[in-house]
Amino acid sequence: MHLTANVLLVPNALKKRDVKYIYNTYLKNYSVIEGVMCCNGDCLAVVVLDRNQLQNTDMEVLESLEYTSDNIELLCEKICVIVDNYDKYYQKNCV
């Protein structure tokens, strides 16, 4: 089975659902490694998908890499940095 490490976007800015709802509604069928919620409610999640899941997901796949521990670590670090920078930008320019 071919596995990939992926970053999924879970749009949530308009609905403002909590983390538990996001996981139970959108991510429960995936192997979630890490998820981070932006201050506006949108979520980025690092998940492991097989080829079939990748082709049939209804969420936006922002990045997809070969499944390795190094790539998982890289993607987890990336989403944390992205959310941190986005939150700083949002607080400065959108509030």
Curated annotation (Swiss-Prot):
Top-level lineage group: Viruses
InterPro entries: AcMNPV_Orf117
Protein name (record): Uncharacterized 11.0 kDa protein in HE65-PK2 intergenic region
Protein's organism: Autographa californica nuclear polyhedrosis virus
